[in-house]
Design a protein with these regions (language model features):
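Alpha-helical transmembrane segments in inner-membrane proteins
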Residues: 1-205
């Protein structure tokens, strides 16, 4: 939530544009990664440092059923909130001015959705660590197959993201068996080339 507050501050609350929000997110990520690295370097033992490194790259190896139950509740509640605002998200694709002209309270709705996303993300990251590129790869693929309407896109992305995580976890346990890789390494191997393709295609449009 400190990272969320930092991003909200840099983006002028809920009034920041998409580009400003992305840049603020990158800045927050670098800042808190630096704080984490400093904490590990100064106060962690070798085993603790290894455990934290696995957590930073994402791993399901230490997840227990009680934590998983909490994640299910938070994710389903957050998904319900997002589905409630699905039509509003459709309007946002045309820009804030267009959404406001339809009577949507843009700052208030943006704040609600940012807070919901922060709650979901914080809960999952606290359990499994930071697993990159899933939020980039899956929605783009689902948008290609199911179109831009968020009521369908949100559900499809949630299901496809869960399937991708299961496959990535299996791959992380088999690639260098009997040892295991962090799940984030597997998703990065898939996500980085895909992200490069997205950037290349956007430049050619």
């Amino acid at each position: 939530f400190a990272a969320f507050a930092f991003v909200a501050l840099l983006t002028n609350g809920a009034r920041g544009g998409n580009e400003r929000t992305i840049l603020a997110g990158v800045a927050a990520s670098q800042l808190f990664n630096a704080i984490t690295a400093y904490t590990i370097s100064t106060s962690a033992s070798a085993q603790q440092a290894r455990d934290v490194m696995f957590w930073l790259l994402g791993s399901f190896s230490g997840v227990r059923w009680p934590e998983f139950q909490l994640v299910i509740v938070v994710v389903l509640a957050g998904l319900a909130v997002c589905l409630w605002y699905a039509r509003t998200l459709d309007a946002f694709t045309f820009g804030d001015d267009a959404a406001a002209s339809l009577g949507i309270a843009v700052p208030r709705v943006r704040l609600i959705l940012f807070t919901t996303a922060a709650l979901i993300t914080a809960t999952i990251v606290s359990m499994a660590g930071s697993i990159g590129f899933v939020g980039l790869v899956v929605p783009h693929v689902m948008r290609f197959f199911f179109g831009p309407l968020h009521r369908t896109l949100l559900i499809a992305s949630a299901l496809a993201g869960a399937i991708l995580m299961v496959l990535a976890d299996i791959a992380s346990r088999l690639l260098i068996a009997p040892q295991s890789l962090p799940v984030g390494v597997v998703t990065a191997l898939v996500g980085v080339p895909f992200f490069a393709v997205i950037i290349y295609r956007s430049r050619n449009k």
